[in-house]
Amino acid sequence: MGFLQFIPNFARMRDNNEEIFPIVDDSGKVLGKATRGECHNGSRLLHPVVHLHVFNSLGEVYMQRRPDWKDIQPGKWDTAVGGHLDYGETPEEALRREVREELGITDFTPKNIGLYVFDSKRERELVYVNSAIYDGEIHPSQEELDGGRFWTMDEIRDAIGKGLLTPNFESEFQRFFLNNPVQG
């Protein structure tokens, strides 16, 4: 690959720190807006994200592998779909957009599971947790993900605490699904 062919791919291999996110209170009420960079620089501005846990009819859980170029938790296994709300977007709109972009799925019925605040040293997220049962084809985005696969509940239990999964996934999965696996 020549140098000029590499440039477009390299440009995609990082997050856009100028994206505009809503800043919210812990009930989801919009208070203002900030860039991705401002939200992820340790300011701990509370911003909303959507998650979709995809189960198949066997009770297995689809997980994505985060690309190594991601600014948060690179190379770890994570929730099937996760993404930020754009400023002016509803959680439902963001969920459908992210599922289409990340997994190529358009025909699914999400179930709202819960809402919580995730705190880390770098950021604070208001997480809208959803699940769905889905047995159709999944086409993970080659630009946004490093693939994905279905995991059994035993595989997830064995991986917890070993540095393979994102801390956010571990805490969320234990909170909402480990003792009640299929909530689609």
Predicted regions located by residue number:
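Short, surface-exposed beta-strand-loop junctions and turns on beta-sheet-rich folds
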Residues: 38, 69-71, 147
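Active-site segment of metal-dependent pyrophosphate-handling enzymes
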Residues: 48, 58, 68, 90, ...
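Active-site acidic-Proline motif in GNAT/NAT acetyltransferases
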Residues: 83-89
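Acidic, metal-coordinating catalytic segment for phosphate/diphosphate chemistry
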Residues: 11-51, 55-57
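A glycine-rich, hydrophobic loop/mini-helix early in the fold
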Residues: 49-81
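N-terminal amphipathic/basic-hydrophobic helices that include classical n-h-c signal peptides
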Residues: 1-12
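Nudix hydrolase/Nudix homology domain
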Residues: 4-6, 75, 87, 114-116, ...
